[in-house]
Each structure stands twice: as C-alpha cells, then as structure tokens.
Amino acid sequence: MLRVDTSSFFLIVLSAAVAAITVAVLPKRIAPPVVVLELLLGIVIGPHGFSLASTDEFSLFFSNLGLGMLFYFAGYEINFDRIRGAPVRLGGRGWLMSIGIAYGLGGVLALLGVIDSFVYTGSAMATTAIGTLIPILRDTGEMKTRFGTYLLGAGAVGEFGPILLVTLFLSTGHPLREAVILVFFVAIAVTIALLSMGVVWRELPMIERTLEASDQLAVRVTVVLIFGLVGLAGHLHLDILLGGFVAGMITRAALRGQEISVFDSKLTAVGFGFFIPFFFIYSGMNFDLEALGSAGAMAKLAMFFGLFLVVRGAPALLLYRHVLPSPQRAALAFYCATELPLVVAITTLAVEAGQMKTSTAAGLVGAAMLSTLVFPFVARGLLEGAGDAAHA
C-alpha cells in the first residue's frame, strides 16, 4: 500500500506558494526566477536541510508528473516552423561542437582519475535545460523575440539530442533493442499525432467553445495525452522526459500553428501552478549536501560549473557572431549553459550503473543547480543592459 506523508506533501505545496509570492513581491530587477526559489526551498525543507519534509513514493509520483509536464512545455513551445533554417542549423552545429568538447574534456579528466566515465560525464555537460528556461523566458518576454527564436533552436537540439543519447546508449547496454523500442514508441506517437491533427482541424470551433465550459475538454484530453505518453515511455523503459517532450510536439502539430491563448493559459495554470513546482522542490529535497562535504567534492562542483560554460557557452559565442550582437551572444552562451533535469537523469543512471562516484554526481548536480541559480540572472542582466544602451 502506498504510504502518503501528508505533512511533507503540504510543505511542498506550501513551498511552491511561498516561491511564487516571493517573486511577485520583490522588485522585478532583483527577483530571481521562481524555479530557483523552488530548488532552494526544497533544499531547506528536505532531509539534507532542516528535515522538515521527507521524500516518499507519493511525492516522487507527482515529481515525475511535473517533469513530464516540464518537457511537455519544452516540446510545445518549440514551433519547428519558427526555428527551421538558421536557428535549428546553428543549434545542431553548436551541440555537436559541445559533444566533441565535452567528450574531449571528459577523456582528459578520466585519464587523470578525476572521473570514471567520460561518456556519462560528457553527456551530462552537453545539455541545455530549455524546459527549465521556458518559464523564465515567458516571464521576461523573450519567447517571441528574434533572440528567443535562436535560443529555442539551440535549446531544442541541446535538450532533444541528449534525450536520444540517454534513451539509446546510456539507459541500458542494448542500444539496438532500445532503438527498436524507440521506433515502436515513435510509431505510436506519429499515429496519435495524425489522428489528433485530423480531429482538431475538424472540430476546432467546438474545442474552442469548451475552453470556457466546465467540462474543459481540450485541457482534459491534453492531460491524458501527456500522462499517457509519459506512462508509455516509462513502461517501455524509455526516459519519461521523451514522453512529455513528444506530447508537446504532438499538441503543437495538432494545432497547426493556431495560437489559442485561453488554452495556453489553462495548461500553464495546470503545469506551472501545481505539477512543475513539485519537480523542482523535490529535486532540491533530494540534493545530497553531505556528498559535498569534502574539499574534493566542492572542487568538482566549481570545476563542472565552469565547464558547463565552456562546453555549451563557447560554441554559442563562436557560431552566432554573424547573426546576434555581442551582448545577445553572451546572453545566449549563459542560457545555453543552464542545465538541470537531464544532468539529474544522466547522473542517476551513471551511479546505478557503477560508472560514476556519488561525489562526482553531487558535483554535477550541484553545478547544474548553481547554473540554474546564476546563469539566467547573468543572461537577463546582459539583455537588459543591451536594451538600456540601445535606448540611451
């Protein structure tokens, strides 16, 4: 029987509310991204903080649903008609450069005995948390800008590429079997997408009418799609991130470029209002502060924090020099180097496979959390400074 710790559950919900209230009352220039506060509050209330709340299977269940919703919005916000051409082409080149740099640096660290596996460590460093960045970009109004288009292109490849790496090569030792399972999953997803596109295109006026009704047909069907594909991915032993991401892409394809603001706002309320904060707070609660107790572990955290910027930021500075001005390129570098969900997923797999020490995993996850705390702040400051200079 599933044990439910109601007090811990309430504290997680309370922490989500406190984070939102704090961001709302602080002046905009100093207000941190809400996901940052959610991570910090998770650390504070968790077993490695003040032990006010404990982790259990019930909270883990909601955290996984939140992770699925987070990647749903990543897939939904990435309009491939918008990013095709230069944005996705440059994003692909940048990620391939990042993989090369990450594996090269990982190989050196493995030879020096600092890490065990350059593949797992390198793969973790070559990610971009576009799902984490989307709420930040929404709040700052960057989603619809030219800069936002290039960032979405870089982030889409920086998120989806590592998901495929995790699915095919890192989660098991049988890439051929995983490829067959992935093809099966994609076939199901494509079938759902084609059916959805036909139904939505034919019944769009009726669907729009139900958005203001109590039955909330569109929202309910979308939630079924998200959790259904997340559950299917988990059942097939694929990463649940893939299920959420594909669900978002299917929804975007079904709408065929239609922007339905009421639908967007209702899904945003469901996702960012409840499920997604669970993932960030639960991630904070699971962060092992004790594993960073040694000087060596802290040195790894600082090293990985800097390497994230080298691996993901340096290609952005190099490749976008003809399409973005210097302040925006610098901001893009910091945004691209922001990492978290996939770092958590990859380090978990690596530790379970015996390919990574817990101190290395803690250093990577700690650096990823620190990147989420710091890099968006720096990027936002660079963009605001460029905007002020342009209007001076």
Where do the PLM segments sit?
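The feature identifies polytopic integral membrane transport proteins across all domains of life
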Residues: 53, 57, 84-95, 112-125, ...
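Structural signal for the N-terminal portions of transmembrane helices
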Residues: 9-14, 60-66, 90-91, 152-155, ...
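Entry/N-cap segments of selected transmembrane alpha helices
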Residues: 8-22, 79-111, 116, 175-191, ...
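C-terminal ends of transmembrane helices
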Residues: 17-30, 71-85, 131-144, 194-207, ...
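Hydrophobic alpha-helical transmembrane segments in multi-pass integral membrane proteins
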Residues: 50, 102-108, 159-173, 225-238, ...
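Membrane-interface junctions of multi-pass transporters
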Residues: 26-30, 44-90, 204-217, 222-302
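Structural signature of hydrophobic alpha-helical transmembrane segments
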Residues: 2-15, 36, 55-72, 115-130, ...
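Short helical (or helix-break) motifs at transmembrane helix termini and adjacent helical loops
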Residues: 99-105, 124-150, 156-165, 311-318, ...
